[in-house]
Amino acid sequence: MEPVPPTPQHQWIKQLVGEWTITGTCTMPDGSTGESKATESAHMVGDYFLHAVLKGKVPGMDVPVECVLIIGFDPDANNFVGTWIGSPMPNLINYTGSLSEDQTTLTLTCDAPDLEDQAKTSAYRDVIVITSDSTREFHSEIQLEDGSWNRFMSSYYTRSETPPPS
């Protein structure tokens, strides 16, 4: 099998590599809000996949949380792909996604258990916005019954260590 050269989308993923500090807010199902602080360590697995590990606490609680995010690009399907797991829940989340025309925003979509009723499934989108070489945002939204999107989590990332050149 011939090696597949990395695509521009694989190159885009590399800007997420590094050590990050994170501050965020989350709106709970009861309407209350919680703040959180965390760290993320992200590296490439070969030329194709990002492996990121977030460690912090559940917003508004003193409960440790660890999450693992994998992001890649599937050239055959012509879309971004990924998975997410987190210690607060037993579900493996599978993403598909696309990059904005201006190359600043990656939108990952998935179906996952509803925030309020775990027996139901809801549509979600997680949005990564590159704001500079050393900052980015991550927003999570759930699709409501009327088709609109409700943002329930926003996180702000600051690079705490420059990644090595790729």
What is each of the regions a protein language model found here?
Residues 1-166:
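Hydrophobic small-molecule pocket/channel-lining residues, especially in calycin-type beta-barrels
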